[in-house]
Amino acid sequence: MAGLADSRVKAVVAVSPPLRLLFEPSSADRIEAKLLLVSGSRDWVVPSVPEAIRPMSETGAAQKGHRLVLVDGADHFSLRSFRGEAQPALMGPLMLGWLNEQLQVPGSPRFSQGGWGDKQIQMVDVSERL
């Protein structure tokens, strides 16, 4: 893992990754870039409890500045949007706000200001509850 570190990377967004398959829980202490993890509440491919909620909780990742956003009712494939689709791209504002905040882009929308998601698809930062 140490050989993969790159000090230029300041922030990372991961959507529905299989955390337990890709990372050892003990490696969480060595992650310097801030992580925004997004998971759908109905993701059956990479379920949110074993692959997002539990790893974030067990490692104390929220106390280190990492965040977990759950998307209510979303499955593994509904978190993406393609050009020309009727469904708006909900992930864009969330990811942009996260990156703006971590990179301290002046005058830009921030993750902590909220406002991402919409009335049909709720996006909730559950990090403080872990």
Whereabouts are the PLM-identified features?
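Preference for short coil/turn "hinge" residues that link or interrupt alpha-helices
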Residues: 2, 67-70, 114-119
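Residue-level preference for alpha-helix termini and adjacent loops
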Residues: 21, 30, 76-78, 110, ...
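Primarily recognizes the serine-hydrolase "nucleophile elbow" in alpha/beta-hydrolase
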Residues: 1-27
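Surface-exposed loop/turn and secondary-structure junction residues enriched for glycine/proline
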Residues: 12, 22, 49, 59, ...
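Catalytic active-site module of serine/aspartate enzymes centered on a nucleophile-bearing elbow/loop
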Residues: 85-130
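Residue-level recognition of the N-termini of beta-strands and the immediately preceding loop/turn
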Residues: 9-10, 66, 111
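Active-site-adjacent alpha-helix of alpha/beta-hydrolase-fold enzymes
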Residues: 30-92, 96-97, 101
